[in-house]
Amino acid sequence: MKRIFRLFVLAMMATAVAVSCNDKEDYVEPTLDVTPNNIAGCWSLDSWSGGELSSCSYVYIDFVRADKTYTLYQNIDSQYMRAITGHYFIYTDDEKGAIIRGNYDYGNGDWSHRYVVTELTEGRMVWTALDNPADVSVYIRATLPSDLQ
C-alpha cells in the first residue's frame, strides 16, 4: 500500500512539474489604466500608421503628471529639432475608452486629432486617431537623448 501511495505522489509531482514548465504560453504584459500618472515620462514614436520613421527622424514626447503638460521634441517637419509645449487632457468615453487630447502653448490651437489610447503597458502604448482609425501611432518608453535637452 505504501508503494502505491509513493507511486501516486510521484505521479502527481511529475504532472505538476510538467504543467508548470509549459513554455507554449507567452507572457502577456498587464495593461495599465490610462491616467496622467501611468503615461508620465518620456516616450518615443516607434511607428506611425504602420510605417517606420526614417533613420534621421525622431519624435519624443515627455509628459509631466503634476500639471498635465508635455514637451514634444521632433524633427518631422524640419531638419532641426523643434520643442513644442502644451497641455494634455485625458477623459474616458463609454464606447471608445481612454481618449487623450491636447493643445499647444502660445495660442497655437488644439492637436489635429483626439486619440484613443490602448495597450498601455509600462513600456508601450498605442494611439489611434478618433476620426481616422487608419492613423495609428505606437510609442515606446524612452530616455530623452541628452543632446535634445
Label every PLM stretch briefly.
Residues 42, 61-70, 92-95, 117-125, ...:
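Short, solvent-exposed coil/turn segments at beta-strand boundaries
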Residues 83-93, 128-149:
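Edge beta-strand at a domain terminus
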Residues 1-19:
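Sec-dependent bacterial lipoprotein signal peptides
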Residues 34-54, 88-90:
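Tryptophan-anchored aromatic micro-motifs
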Residues 15-40, 146-149:
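Bacterial Sec-dependent N-terminal signal peptides
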Residues 47, 71-75, 99-105, 125-130:
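Short beta-strand segments that buttress and anchor functional surface loops
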Residues 94-118:
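An anionic, turn-rich surface loop/hairpin at beta-sheet edges
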Residues 54-99:
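N-terminal glycine/threonine-rich, aromatic-flanked beta-hairpin/loop signature
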